[in-house]
From Swiss-Prot:
Function: Inhibitor of protein-phosphatase 1 (PP1). Binds to and inhibits PP1 activity. Required for early embryogenesis progression.
Effect of W43A: Loss of binding to protein-phosphatase 1 (PP1)
Knockout or disruption consequences: Embryonic lethality due to embryo development arrest at globular stage.
The keyword DNA-binding belongs to this UniProt entry's keyword annotation: no
Protein name: Protein phosphatase 1 regulatory subunit INH3
Quaternary organization: Interacts with protein phosphatase 1.
Distribution of this protein across tissues and organs: Expressed in roots, cotyledons, leaves, flowers and embryos.
Residue spans of biased composition, Low complexity class: 1-14, 95-107
Keywords: Protein phosphatase inhibitor
Species the sequence originates in: Arabidopsis thaliana
Length: 107
C-alpha cells in the first residue's frame, strides 16, 4: 500500500483598511507656563539706615557706578573707583557695593 502525500496549500488573505485623514480636525496646542514665586524683600528687625531717618536700608550704594566694557582700560581712573563713598561697604570690581553685614533677606 502506498500513500500519496499532497503538498499542503495555504492561502493568505491580507485586508488593509485605510482611514481617510480628516482635514477638518483642528490642531490643538498646549502652552505650559511656570508659576514663579513672587520675589519678596523682608527686613530684619532693627534695620535702620546710617542717617537715623527710620528708613529701611539696603546693601546697594546710593552712588551710581557706571559699568565699563571688559576691554576698556581704566588704569588712569583707578582712584575714581573709590570715589568718596563713606558708606559701610566695599566696592567690587563690577561696581556693585557689598557689605560685611547684610541687612536684607530676599525670599
Amino acid at each position: 500500500m502506498s500513500t500519496a502525500t499532497r503538498p499542503s496549500s495555504s492561502a493568505t488573505t491580507s485586508v488593509i483598511l485605510e482611514n481617510p485623514v480628516s482635514q477638518s480636525q483642528p490642531t490643538e496646542r498646549l502652552v505650559l507656563r511656570l508659576n514663579r514665586k513672587k520675589k519678596k524683600v523682608s527686613w530684619k528687625d532693627g534695620t535702620v539706615d546710617n542717617e537715623f531717618m527710620q528708613k529701611k536700608s539696603s546693601k546697594k550704594c546710593c552712588i551710581f557706578h557706571k559699568q565699563k566694557p571688559f576691554d576698556e582700560d581704566d588704569s588712569e581712573e583707578e582712584d575714581d573707583n573709590n570715589h568718596h563713598c563713606d558708606h559701610n561697604h566695599e566696592h567690587s570690581e563690577s561696581g556693585e557695593a557689598s557689605s560685611s553685614n547684610d541687612s536684607k533677606a530676599v525670599d
